[in-house]
Each structure stands twice: as C-alpha cells, then as structure tokens.
Amino acid sequence: MKIVHTADWHLGKILNGKQLLEDQKYILTQFKQHMEKEQPDLIVIAGDLYDTSYPSKEAIGLLEETIEYLNIELKIPIIMISGNHDGRERLNYGSKWFENNQLYIRTQLENIDDPIELSGVQFFTLPFATVSEVQNYFKDKQIETYQQALNECLEQMSSSIDNNKVNILIGHLTIEGGKTSDSERPLTIGTVESVDMHSFRLFDYVMLGHLHHPFSINNSFIKYSGSILQYSFSEVNQSKGYRVLDIENNQLLNETFVPLKPLRELEVIEGDYEDIIQERIKVKNKNNYFHFKLTNVSHITDPMMKLKQIYPNILALSNVVFDHSENFSHVEIKKQDDQTIIENFYKNMTDQHLSQVQSDKIKHLLSFILDREG
C-alpha cells in the first residue's frame, strides 16, 4: 500500500497583504501531476486545508476542484481531518455521502475510536480540538492540558487497536521540541500546547499536520508533512512537498519526502539600499516574494515604490538603522565629549550626519545647560 501524506494547504492565505491563491493553484496543479505518476492507494490530508474558518469562494473552489480531480478522476481514496484553521462545520458538510467515493472527512471527536480500514490498515483520526472541547466530550473537568486531553483520546482509541494490523494515527497537533514557524497560529492561549512524542506508542506510524517544517522532529515513525508552500519569512530555504509511505505485508517498508517546486519562493535579503537598486546583490529570482532589510533607506523618498519597479513582489521592507559594529564601549563613550556622543548617536539611528544648523543648535543647548549647572 502506498500512502501520500500532506497537510497545511492553508488555501486563501494572505501574506503581508498578498493573496497567495495563484501560488496555491500552481503548487496543487503540480501535486495533482505527481499523483498521476505516484498512483497512491490513499492520500492523507492532516488538517488546515483552509487558512480561515470562513474561506473565500475562490479558496473553496480550489479545494473542491483539487479533491474532485484526485478522488473522482484519479479514483484515489482520501482521508482528511480538520485543523485549527479550518471551520469544522463547513469542512464536514456532505461528509456522509462522500464516503461512498472513499472520501473520508473527519472533524468530530465522536469518530476517534472508529478507525477507517483500507487494505488491512487501520487509520485513526484525531482532528484538532481545544482542551475545553475534549473536556466537554468526555465530561471530565479534570482535563486541563493538551497532554491530558490527548491521553483521554488515546485511551478511547486503544480499545479499537488491532495488533494484527498496521495502526496509523492522523492528527493535527504540536510535538514537544518540534521546530515552529511564524505562520503557525498557536493552538491555544495560556496553555502548554505541545505533547510528548512517547504518547503514541500504540501506533505503528503517526501522520501529523500543524507544524510547517517537514523535518520539525527527528523521529522514525512520527512525521510532519509540512506545509505545501513557504507561508512566512521564517520558512525561507525550507523545502516543501509531501511524504510517501510504503506498506507491504503489515510492514512499513520505507518513507520518503518528495519536494515540490513553487511558482515563487520567499527570500530575505540584507544589504545597502543602493546595492539592491543597482542590482549588485544577487537574488534567486526577481519575481520571488522579498523581505528587504536595508541600510541607508531613511533619506529615500518612497523606497518601496522604487524597489517594486525591479522586484514587483516585495512584501516587506525594514530600515536597518543601527549597525552594532559601530557601537562604542562604555570606556570609549567616557572619553568623548557630549557633542560627539550626540552626533554619533544620531548617525547610528538615522544613517545621516547632523547638518551644520543642527550641530550648532546642539552646541548652543549644551553650552546653555552647562552654564546653568555651573
């Protein structure tokens, strides 16, 4: 049995005001082409199909088009669960009759001890749920942490584990010690959200969503697929793609990560404004999404507009005005007069020298203060 594991599509994502639907459509078209060649026996989508619980009609249309092609045209069974970004009710709509085409949508805790069995493999689903939702489901107010909530869910699943079969868990959560990214919305406020990886010993393999780095943790049987695109500048240079797991005769044979190539990558470029404008600093692709961190910007009128003429998809510009290499030690500062200290501070903060008029005014003020104190 060949299983493809993906997650965190975040359809409808907006990054720094830029709608990413074009990029998402491009990457999902590529994903569909890969599935034509892979011909998997199952696709698992481990949550966060949408970026918001109220997705746009364009985002809904893209998901429907993609799932219809994979499930109806290619006839690939699909199991998907809801993540913390998804609107559970919207995603769950029509789920009962979709199962006639082997499209299994699991968004409710009521199904956690009812595994989906395909080709002799049991797939347990654990959609995202808050601690309070788990409290209410089990009618147990003693559940106060994510670890306790997970333990209750796993305890209920344990009665359905068949040790004569391969048992796989599909979940949307944070493993303790996993690498995080800026684009991941916290699962909770005020509660530790990570769980111990040793909690999953019941299972032969665990397929997760939520963390966007495909190598968030180093574990042979617990894997994140990662997101399909770079969704924050903290994910620069991260490979994005999907995982493939092969099972034969109740044995996990091998697992591989398959990268996808995006329409545009995210780049963070540091340097001097003039070097960027004159294209003296090399970038991977001028059409990528950029965050420029530049010096000598403060005196430029509308630098963003000027940069966009060369780099049309710039999303962020930071004015780097303080160079730590020019810091002065306490000893050096004590050796300087007040006028020099002020002039150096102004230069460090603005990348400009005081004008003669400004310098004269400061000299006058310092003289006035010293005279008053004397």
From Swiss-Prot:
Record's keyword annotation contains Nucleotide-binding: no
Signal sequence, start to end: none
Name of this protein: Nuclease SbcCD subunit D
Gene name, Swiss-Prot/TrEMBL: sbcD
Family indicated by similarity: Belongs to the SbcD family.
The entry's keywords: DNA recombination, DNA replication, Endonuclease, Exonuclease, Hydrolase, Nuclease
Function: SbcCD cleaves DNA hairpin structures. These structures can inhibit DNA replication and are intermediates in certain DNA recombination reactions. The complex acts as a 3'->5' double strand exonuclease that can open hairpins. It also has a 5' single-strand endonuclease activity.
SUPFAM superfamilies (UniProt xref): Metallo-dependent phosphatases (SSF56300)
Annotated source species: Staphylococcus epidermidis (strain ATCC 35984 / DSM 28319 / BCRC 17069 / CCUG 31568 / BM 3577 / RP62A)
Domain of life: Bacteria
